Amino acid sequence: MDQEHLNPEALNFPFPAIIGVDEAKKALLAALVSDDIRTVLIQGGTGSAKTTLIRSLTGISEREVLNLPLGTNDDQVFGIIDLEETLLTGERRMMPGILQKSDLNILHADDVNLMDHSLLDQLLESVNRQKALVEREGLSYEYRCRTTFIGTMN
């Protein structure tokens, strides 16, 4: 059976069945239930079930897990103001980035230590403020981002 026909739920290992990562599990559970915990960093060696653990969160939470690929740029993360539509309609229109799409969900970045540091700083600031600001061509757009950011690294 090829990948496109696999049930995405079948790819997720059950959260309770993952063993040997108790501290990481406690941190993730705390982040799921607390509005005050907005970021979690999990460090572990290759093959230590970091990504499996993050994916398993969909089985114990209503929240989706969105992945932030390494090499993603500012516009892909924060979104862009659709200047053409804004000029045509007179209303600011936003083309959302992954941060806006992750509102009320979980945003996961693997190898977070390899991310562009400036982008990571802006991302963490937005997550902690629960608001993101996009400024382009003299226009600005602010949106809520009540996301939980989880970074993993070796």
Say what each PLM segment does.
Residues 9-43:
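Pre-Walker A (pre-P-loop) alpha-helix and adjacent loop at the N terminus of AAA/AAA+ ATPase modules
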Residues 29-32, 86-107:
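Conserved alpha-helical scaffold flanking the Walker A/P-loop in AAA+ ATPase domains
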Residues 30-34, 122-130:
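P-loop NTPase nucleotide-binding module
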Residues 32-70:
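Walker A/P-loop
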Residues 37, 43-45, 87-98, 112, ...:
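Conserved Walker
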Residues 44, 53, 73-74, 100-127:
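Conserved AAA+/SF3 P-loop NTPase catalytic/coupling segment centered on the Walker-B
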Residues 60-86:
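AAA+/P-loop NTPase substrate/partner-engagement loops
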Residues 108-109, 134-135, 147-154:
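Structural recognition of the conserved hydrophobic beta-strand(s) that form the central parallel beta-sheet
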